[in-house]
Amino acid sequence: MICAYLQERFPNTHFHFIAAGIPSLGSLAHSFRLQRDVLDSGKVDLMFVEAAVNDRGSGVDSATQMHSLEGIARHAWKSNPSMDMIFMEFADTYKNNDYDKGTVPGEVFRHEAVAIHYNLPSINLAKEVHDKIRNGEFDWNNDFKDIHPAPLGEELYFENIKKFLELSFNHVPADLKITDHALIKPTSKYSFEDGHYDDVTHAQHDANWTYNSNWTPSNRESTRDGFVNVPMLTTEAIGATLKFPFTGNAVGIAVVSGDDTGIISYSIDNDAPQRLDLYTEFSNWLYLPYYQLLGKDLKNGKHILTIKMEKDKNLNSKGNACRIVHFLVNG
């Protein structure tokens, strides 16, 4: 709807729209996929950013959310200093409950904190939905229905975004010149402003790992676009080990977590190993794109990430599998 509105509003303008949204992904994923999924498509003039819905359920801590959101803004402006950005916060039942208690949802607070720091507009659609429900204008279960809203919710989102754009366009002077945004001092030196994907072929691994150039599931579990029929580094073997050399101050993995996903142990350089269960509450029916940061706030430089498949597994998992789609590197 927004694309159609912009084309109607500016009929003499040729638009190139990039539909980069992927269900289940939050700010951490966005900060590392921004380059490939958006910026590599060409010079971007206007970018909409939303991660508030999925950040709550992703298990990503508040500091990492801030590093991610700030990294998105800074990375975008390093690509095109004149790019305009609009932050948005979509609705869910968790946010409704927070607002009922008089509390600003943490995900909304962090989106707005980054927006304020960089003088970016922020459209709080979660608060709009909550207030209309409390005013009796509609009901969540019967009308709005889901975080992927029913037509009523889609129309509400569209009208609010359109209203903001109309107000902005109507206050633009005829002689306005495009200027660069100032890349001010970050709130943290560890923001993921250089976040990117690194190829799984760069890992050094034992014979228990297999490079699959076009992975598809062997069962009937659901998948997400961009995370099926793509290259992956996979294993189902206990003890399978790999080493991934990287340069930067943060590292992680993007995996697909299905019903046989296992537990890994990992370490960076000579640190003590830590354990991470890659099985999720959705893994019994979906190969969930699952982004996990394994090291952050590191000294900027060369490091080695080591990953090993553990013998034990989640009680609900059917195996000890790990399927890595991307390594994540900030640097």
Predicted segments with their positions:
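Alpha-helical cap/lid subdomain in secreted, periplasmic
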Residues: A4-H16, A20, L25, S31-A174, ...
